[in-house]
Amino acid sequence: MEQEVLVLDGGPLSGPQVVAVARSKCSVDIGPVAIDLMQSAQDVVHAVATSGKATYGINTGFGALSTTRIDHDKLTELQMNILRSHAAGVGEPLDEEIVRGMMVLLAASLCRGMSGSRPEVAQRLAEMLNKGVTPVVPSRGSVGASGDLAPLAHLALVLCGEGEAMYGEQTMAGKDAMGEAGITPISPIEKEGLALINGTHMMASIASLALADIAILCEAAVTSTAMAIDAAKATDTFLDQRLHLARVQSGQQTVA
């Protein structure tokens, strides 16, 4: 897919759009509709955070600590700590294209305005994609069930000026990569840390890239098989349309 700029407007992404950003380095921008959606949602979260009411994920602990109240002046520290505590992946780093796919999928999710994050968060992710800052994300640490928590935590730490990243084909501290690219890291406010890791964007990225590869392989298989049939001067009676209509399999019919 060739597209100069992918504008995230709060709608869903197609597989080819993810691949365009992940592999072809298509630029990403955040549309005005998405900015309004995110700002409206963040206004609600901020109102809850300043109301004095205990609300999970905003001013409480997480999991077993859900009944522990967190003081308002420690909410940024709370959100940073959930990123640091979950950045526990191991193994070889994921390929750059997988991480870039994660980044655009995460940005698109935030742009829906249902996560309560500020527009700046998605805008920084887009800026990282456009300037070539790619977080180093270990390949092991998630099965994509209740969320790719560890991989996304490694990604989000770079967004916040921590962790490790690739920039200019060199691995360096996330803070240095952001600095060299001229990107200002964010300091996550209420709920943003949770919003950054509570998703299955790694699995979705891997699936998008795998589907693109499968489509290419299927086309190659069909073409090479047709050429082999022609070269061998084999019969083509097995391609009779009536046979394949009887099977009611759309893929089989298309190949035939």
Regions of interest found by a model, annotated:
Residues 1-256:
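Conserved, well-structured ligand/cofactor-binding cores
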